[in-house]
Amino acid sequence: DTSVVICTIGFFSNLRDLLQSGADEYSDLSGKELVAKKVKRLVSMAGLFPEGKEFNVYCDVPASKVVAEEWPTEIVFSGFEIGNVILTGKKLVQMNVENSPVKDAYALCFAEGDPEGRMSWDHTAVLVAIKGYEPYFDVERGTFHVVDDEGTNNWVANPNGRDLRLIEKMPPTEVASLIENYMMHQRSIK
């Protein structure tokens, strides 16, 4: 029924394991068949575009290759270059709120030398998984490849490709402000 969107902000190890799993007591479908039936898309913070090496790809190259080659539905890639210029956290650490693990983590980052904000690599993937890429980003359709055993990736533009990669559309400062507003949200207690 393609009702599921999966977002990954780390290595592809668990998704490789899913693809290679067989039927079990929960489903007669293999992992790959289950993904094909249930998953609309995978949104992933992975890769450096148009070509390069990125941490989430090169830390488990075999898993990255399996997912790149065998994932049965669309993959949207939020590359390193997207989140690298979207800096968040500056307003968050100035909030008058106590006992906030997010605020505390960002305060530590600022103390370690990120005075203008922390790069938002993972945040962009989460934003797109929940809200979609419009109006924040443009996309280019193509194919993501892991080209060597060192985890280098490249991108081949192709209007019929399975994959999408995010391309800057809104100014990074506007995307940062939007993400930071979500990060600063405080639930109302009734």
Where are these regions (language model features)?
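N-terminal acidic, glycine/proline-rich low-complexity segments
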Residues: 1-190
